[in-house]
Amino acid sequence: YLVNGGKSCMAGFVLKNTLSDNGGVTRGICKMDENGNLTEVVETKNIVKTATGAEADGKVIDVDSLVSMNMWGLTPDFLDVLEEGFKEFFEKEVPDNPLKAEYLIPIFIGELLEQGKMSVKVLRTNDTWYGMTYHEDVVAVKDSFKKMLENGVYKADLFSDL
């Protein structure tokens, strides 16, 4: 997308491909316009698998929703914008809480979207997200990566072709 002139994009994972069998997870559910541009990311906590799909705190969640796993495609120009935002963040947020203040890129991008200063194309992926939210997730993730190695998806020496 970026090599063809796009400015900003984000991988949109299908929610059902990002859930843990071992408990609730937090996911950023994407809202988009009719052209597939990101309009908002709604951080949703404690999303759990159910017999019929998924829910968060008793509310049914569409398992086909696209979610952000913070895989952004950004151009070098974005670094200038990011730096300006960081200066403002450092002046306003750090003095109040110097040990815990965090400059979160998704929050910053959300502010830019709200202000109309940025657009982000959501690129749907049907791939599985291999997360390890719970200790019990480790075995399944290891098994999945072992299978991908056996099937040639990845090489044992991941960077051998660089």
Outline where the language-model segments fall.
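Residues that recognize and position ribonucleotide moieties
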Residues: 71-72, 102, 131
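Residues that scaffold the ATP/ADP-binding catalytic core of kinase and kinase-like folds
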Residues: 41, 81-82, 141
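A C-terminal functional module that forms or caps the active site or interfaces directly
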Residues: 83-118
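Glycine-rich loop/turn
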Residues: 54-60, 110-125
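Hydrophobic helical membrane-anchoring modules
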Residues: 117-119, 126-162
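Conserved core of the sugar-phosphate nucleotidyltransferase
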Residues: 1-72, 76
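Glycine-rich "substrate-gating" loop/helix at the edge of Rossmann-like oxidoreductase active sites
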Residues: 69, 95-98, 127-129
